[in-house]
Amino acid sequence: MILINDKNCSDLKIVFSELPSIPKPVRNVEEKFVSGRDGSLIIDRGTYQNIPIMLIGHAGCKRTELIDYFGTTGELKFETSPDRFWKYRVTAIDVKEVLDDGVLLAFSINMSLGPHKYLVSGKSKIIGSSTLSLKNDYNANAYPFLKIKGTGTIGIIKNGIQILSIKDITDYVDIDCEADVIHRNNVNYDNKAIGDTFYLDANKTTELKFTGNVSEVILIPNWREI
């Protein structure tokens, strides 16, 4: 069985013909052949392609309930791996009524999964103030979300190097490293920032230091792996 946004498919009496296995994502590697040179030139961009899958089955619910259950984007989790999930986007959905009353449906859903498996534990909050030591035990860089409470100008130092400074903070500021956005109450703070958002390096410990008038830092690491 699967869970969509932590809701079990059995709640809607969904039965799958067969659950797909999720392959490893394809790495974006380009091979170029150069005249007068043996072999080829390999350009590895260090990124991965999304993973297409199809879910086929039957459901004992209404059509609108089935469509609302999967939505357009969300989190997909398998009961066999409850500690991990994929972020997905629905690319196509086909639903047919098997019975005239519309309470037995046949469906096929095409999804595009992001290349990374996310750790459920990566949603847990890590709380500190002036320093944080974060060990990434996984094979992919993690892009955290931070809420920094404080006032004035606040700086972030990663492994001894200042990477970001934000001014004119009142009460708090949010930093979404995955979306590369700095904001407070949906007001963009990019014009008040110097530097870049950051990631937590794969298979390493990242030391963060926060300078300025900081009272508390709340960080969600978003651990993930390939």
Segments from the language model and where they lie:
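Mixed-charge, glycine-accented linear interaction segment located at domain edges/termini
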Residues: I2-K7, S112-G114, Y199
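Oligomerization/assembly interface segments of phage tail-like spikes and tubes
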Residues: E31-C61, V103-H116, T206
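Solvent-exposed loop and beta-edge segments used for protein-protein assembly and interaction
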Residues: T47-Q49, F70, D101-L105, Y138-A140, ...
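Short, acidic/charged, Gly/Pro-enriched secondary-structure junctions
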Residues: I56-D94
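Short, charged interaction patches at domain edges and termini
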Residues: I93-I126
